[in-house]
Amino acid sequence: MPEKTAVLLLQMGGPDSIEAVEPFLLNLFSDREIIKIGPAFLQPFIARRICRKRAPKVEGYYSQIGGKSPIRELTEAQAQALEEKLGGNFRCFVAMRYWKPTTIDALAAIKREGISRVIALSLYPHYSRATTGSSINELKRVLGEAGARFEVSYVDRFYDHPLYIAALAAKIEEGLAQFSNRSEVELVFSAHSLPQSFIDEGDPYLSHILETVRLVMERLGNVNYHLAFQSRAGPVKWLEPSTEEMIQKLAKGGCKELLMVPLSFVSDHIETLYEIDIQYAEEAKGLGIEHFRRSPSLNTSPLFIDCLANLVHKTVSSE
């Protein structure tokens, strides 16, 4: 009987209760690969002060979307769908970078099943050292500290995979179907922002985002589209334009029909359910945009699961 292979899905994670918001934020702001706050030895203390101040506001956001992030349940559903697609020689596990189940939890579960072969598959389509890079480095750190004997391969990007592009285009078509005349719709790809300094230092994130947009628009054809960046925080220069600025610009130009496309997210969480569905929707309405919609997230889209399965099979066959 062939030896089983573990597929470890790497994701950001999110608080599973209101009480978990502050410790989740602390884990996030303590990671120097995503944000550097002062000298390394001071970052934990500065991060704690920042999180204590930010937590009440962020808790309010989560209280409006059910009191927690759905990202764990959705990622576990993706893992289950992928395992069913791959068949009996594969087992799928989830590792969250900033919450539970942690990387240590996931590796312990893999070890309990007696599996030594692991494919670590990042669920961030577009590589950045702040996201995929941080998750992979955390995995390598845990493996080193544990002295665990796993044979690990890494899938760290899939921004141009044909099945990912097809899945994204299909969801956008679902979104466009909510409008009576697609020629009047302004489509806004909204990607998670990143400090401009990352790009200046050679991070490929922006080039990956631009290529995804190009490939998707090749499929969609004649639709007016724009690219913007959401979720920036702090006083440093971030990628531009921001999603808020783009909405304001389109409204000023007379836009009445707007479809938001969450681009760097493969499942629903705070950025889609609160930022887009509540915050940006309210802003758009106040600016006179009459029909504001969002294309559905990929979640367990069969095309997206096919993409993940293909990435796994390609990794296995290349060894």
UniProtKB/Swiss-Prot annotation:
Key word Phosphoprotein present: no
PROSITE patterns for the chain: FERROCHELATASE
One record GO biological process: heme biosynthetic process
CDD domains, sorted: Ferrochelatase_C, Ferrochelatase_N
Binding site for Fe cation: 192, 271
InterPro entries membership: Ferrochelatase (IPR001015), Ferrochelatase_AS (IPR019772), Ferrochelatase_C (IPR033644), Ferrochelatase_N (IPR033659)
GO molecular function, one term: ferrochelatase activity
E.C. numbers: 4.98.1.1
Family classification: Belongs to the ferrochelatase family.
Protein name, as recorded: Ferrochelatase
Superkingdom: Bacteria
UniProt function note: Catalyzes the ferrous insertion into protoporphyrin IX.
Reactions it catalyzes: heme b + 2 H(+) = protoporphyrin IX + Fe(2+)
Gene: hemH
Keyword terms: Cytoplasm, Heme biosynthesis, Iron, Lyase, Metal-binding, Porphyrin biosynthesis
Pfam family, one: Ferrochelatase
Residues annotated as transmembrane: none
Biological or metabolic pathway of the protein: Porphyrin-containing compound metabolism; protoheme biosynthesis; protoheme from protoporphyrin-IX: step 1/1
One GO cellular component term: cytoplasm
UniProt subcellular location: Cytoplasm
